[in-house]
């Protein structure tokens, strides 16, 4: 705990505080929130079809940050020994010793508390269902130890984002189909790009007997599975568009989303481009389609 807290009689220099904040943001990959926040707010606006209150938007943001912090910290803690053996991940904070497990546990607690507080502040309904994503976050890091379907565990975790935004507005399961379609799109999209990301660890996964489509099928066949998943993802998004949105002003953004999914497959060999940059833009394209289409 000494890494996170100092006594009041021993003030910490501002440079040290900034260094630690940078370390914690790097640890949880704070920039990856760009994947989830547009999807959360897509769920919000799809459900409300209007501009919600600033209070609700702020609480949704807080819940998203808390949930993302908890999810990434759980993943890093559960996989720390695997990461220590993987040349690609050995320099991460826990394997390298730049962060201790107690520090990570405190960060996990912080994320869970922030998430729980935000869910409770929105409504008792959202608070009661708030443990569901946490259970998924705990479970999916273990999936690659026994099933190649682990990619769908990652997708399922992020598919909670649009549902969370939907439930923050609706606070019931009534009329869930549009929110469910957005969630299924997210599940398929994320599972597909997780297969692309796993190509970085093809040899390591085989050596460690970890399960993935790439390790079981080989890179080319696994990327074929990824392309099919992204094709189905676009089909689900198109169904959502024609079923619920039906605003031609938003149609160009639907096409942009399809083009980005296609580009992600064409540039799958460049994981930095496909996984990080294209996906960040794609999330905002989906949000833009929903925002423009329902208001």
Q: Which residues are covered by each model-predicted region?
A:
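Cytosolic, membrane-interface loops and tails of multi-pass inner-membrane proteins
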Residues: 5-22, 72, 76-99, 194-220, ...
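Extended hydrophobic alpha-helices typical of membrane-associated regions
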Residues: 19, 232, 239-295
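Intramembrane alpha-helical segments
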Residues: 21, 25-26, 62, 92-177, ...
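Membrane interfacial helix-start motif at the N-side
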Residues: 22-35, 98, 144, 212-224, ...
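Small-residue-rich segments of transmembrane alpha-helices in multi-pass membrane proteins
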Residues: 38-43, 154-169, 216, 278-293
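Membrane-embedded alpha-helical segments that form the functional core of polytopic membrane enzymes
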Residues: 38-80, 88, 109-119, 127-139, ...
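Multi-pass membrane catalytic core of lipid/isoprenoid biosynthesis enzymes
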Residues: 57-62, 80-130, 207-248
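Residues within membrane-spanning alpha-helices of integral membrane proteins
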Residues: 105, 109-112, 130, 134, ...
């Amino acid at each position: 705990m000494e890494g996170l807290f100092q006594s009041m009689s021993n003030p910490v220099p501002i440079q040290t505080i900034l260094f630690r904040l940078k370390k914690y943001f790097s640890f949880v990959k704070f920039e990856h929130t760009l994947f989830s926040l547009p999807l959360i707010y897509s769920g919000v606006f799809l459900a409300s079809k209007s501009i919600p209150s600033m209070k609700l938007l702020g609480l949704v943001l807080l819940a998203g940050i808390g949930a993302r912090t908890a999810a990434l910290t759980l993943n890093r803690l559960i996989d720390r020994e695997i990461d220590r053996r993987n040349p690609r991940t050995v320099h991460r904070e826990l394997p390298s010793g730049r962060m201790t497990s107690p520090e990570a546990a405190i960060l996990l607690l912080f994320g869970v508390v922030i998430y729980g507080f935000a869910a409770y502040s929105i409504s008792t309904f959202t608070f009661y269902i708030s443990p569901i994503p946490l259970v998924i976050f705990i479970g999916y890091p273990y999936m690659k130890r026994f099933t190649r379907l682990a990619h769908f565990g990652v997708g399922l975790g992020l598919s909670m984002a649009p549902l969370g935004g939907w439930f923050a507005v609706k606070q019931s399961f009534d009329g869930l189909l549009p929110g469910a379609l957005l969630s299924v799109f997210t599940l398929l999209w994320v599972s597909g790009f997780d297969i692309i990301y796993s190509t970085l660890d093809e040899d390591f996964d085989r050596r460690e007997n970890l399960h993935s489509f790439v390790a079981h099928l080989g890179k080319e066949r696994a990327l074929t599975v990824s392309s099919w998943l992204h094709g189905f993802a676009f089909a689900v998004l198109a169904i959502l568009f024609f079923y619920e949105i039906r605003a031609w002003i938003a149609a160009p953004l639907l096409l942009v989303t399809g083009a980005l999914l296609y580009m992600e497959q064409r540039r799958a060999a460049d994981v930095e481009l496909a996984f990080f940059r294209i996906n960040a833009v794609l999330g905002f394209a989906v949000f833009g389609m929903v925002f423009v289409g329902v208001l």
